[in-house]
From Swiss-Prot:
Keyword Glycoprotein: no
Binding residue positions for ATP: 10-20
CDD domains in the cross-refs: QueC-like (cd01995)
Name assigned to this protein: 7-cyano-7-deazaguanine synthase
Annotated keywords: ATP-binding, Ligase, Metal-binding, Nucleotide-binding, Zinc
Co-factor: note: Binds 1 zinc ion per subunit.
GO molecular-function terms, A-Z: ATP binding; ligase activity, forming carbon-nitrogen bonds; zinc ion binding
Function as written in the Swiss-Prot or TrEMBL entry: Catalyzes the ATP-dependent conversion of 7-carboxy-7-deazaguanine (CDG) to 7-cyano-7-deazaguanine (preQ(0)).
Gene name for this UniProt entry: queC
Binding of Zn(2+), residues: 212, 220, 223, 226
Protein family: Belongs to the QueC family.
Listed HAMAP family: QueC
Record-linked InterPro entries: QueC, Rossmann-like_a/b/a_fold
Amino acid sequence: MAVCRAVSIVSGGPDSFTYTLIWLSRGCSVHALSFNYGQKASREVLTARKLLEKADELASERGWGRVLEHRLVDISFMKSLWRGTQLTDEEVEVKEDYAPSVVVPIRNVVMLSIAAAYAYSLLEEEDVDRVVVTYGAQRGDIKPRPDTGEPLYPDCSPECIEALQAAFRLCHFRGMRRLEVWSPSREGLSKSDLLKWAYGTVGKLIYDTWSCYLNGKYHCGRCESCINRHRAFKDAGLPDCTRYEKPPGPEAEFESRGDYYVHRSCREA
């Protein structure tokens, strides 16, 4: 039987978590990496750990690949270099709508380079037939900017991924050049596609993911990521049981439950 390993970048959000589940379901055992890069939403790392523990339980029950480990990679020193971005710079406000300042320059390239280095180490240590590096970039991340026509997040594009894969192979020994880099965007999958797959496969666990750019008790409901999360649940035709501090859509569509809001599509108490 072919042995597959995936080095999966898992942020705690629905995209990277679901895509990791997909590779587990394909029979690949996962070495999960989460990154502390000085982001404001530091709770996403703790979320990733809890989700991966549950994912491994499900994988064991279903005969999938296993979550072999979860490593936290500390690159928080990059915060001082990634200035002027909404996600790391305390002096830059997190906005409701997309703005180029939400893009952390080639953040995914940095993380994928580290993941690829680890993946090559696995190829040298183990008898592995296939090794893939995965991350959660999805089709919505590469919609064209209205002003320039280029992807909203350039390092999420299939072109970037394929170029990186080629570079990673070129930059190591010929006998090791079988490393693959994959993302939902490369497979043509959107956030709503991922939510539908996850909801149909692991059910309510998808609500435990964390999308918000901030670090509050609940999803803020105001940042671009919260708004995109809610829109994707609607596009997928799924109830959104996420707890929001403020409604990420028309207030009439949400129900106040004490100190948070939930969309009326959610029937949970």
